[in-house]
Each structure stands twice: as C-alpha cells, then as structure tokens.
Amino acid sequence: MQKIVTLILLTLSVFGTGFADEDNFKVKKSEAEWRKELTPEQYEVLRGQGTERPFTSQCLHIKENGEYHCAGCDNLLFTSGAKFKSGTGWPSFFEPRKGSVVIRTDTSHGMTRKEVLCADCGGHLGHVFSDGPGPTGLRYCINGVALEFQPEE
C-alpha cells in the first residue's frame, strides 16, 4: 500500500496536479456551472488547461484601447497599453494588472513552464516567458478565448 501511495505522489509531482487548489480562489463554481456558462472552447482552455490554435484569436486583431478581462469571471487582467505583437500567434502582454494573475509551475507535456492563472477564478490563461520587451522583459502568452475585450469608453 505504501508503494502505491508513493507512486501516486511521485506521478503527481512529475506531471502536475491539474488545477490549482480551487479553495484559494474567490469565484467558485461547479464544473456543471462552468460548462453551462462557457463556450466549449472557453471551457477547454480555462478549465481544461487547453491551448487554442495559434493565429485563431480575434484578440490578435484588436487595435483599439481597452481592457482584457477573464472570460470566466470578468476579472480585469490586462490593458491594451501592455499588449504587444509577439508574432507567436497568441495575444501577448508584457505585464498583467497588479494582483490579477497567479503564476504556478506547469510540468505538463514533458517540460517546465510558468502557467498563468486568473487570480479570481483559477482559470488557465496561458504561460509567461522571459523573452518579452521592456519594461519587464516578460511575455504573457495568453489564449485569446480566455479573454473578453472591453473597449475604452
């Protein structure tokens, strides 16, 4: 029995545990509620840690000023002033709004990356890399389907 428990713990540490502990997030919904409120694509990314295909996001083409909110809970995540064209196929930002995201280690798919989660609902947004422009040198590579754009009034 002890060998089985050890094997399970080792597997979880190598492959990750899926979602962050949902007790840490303000917005709490059942999986049935998430499925009802999100489109299938949003659910796959935000709740299933999926990745949308590159160059498919409508957010790539938004040029106007405004704010990018979490599609799952409406948390303000990024502003258009922090958006830049990375050429990667996903909306990219050099910094989030303070306190709006949580970073955790993602060891899925045989690599180690820094996963970006919404600080309010724990939804998977994308990953952050250290190859971005100034002033931070960071590139928050975000799935556009996880975002809702609200134009500046």
Walk through the language-model features, giving the residues of each.
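Short, contiguous pre-domain boundary segments
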Residues: F19-E31
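Sec-dependent signal peptide recognition
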Residues: Q2-I8
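Enrichment for repetitive, rod-forming helical segments
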Residues: L9-L10, Q42
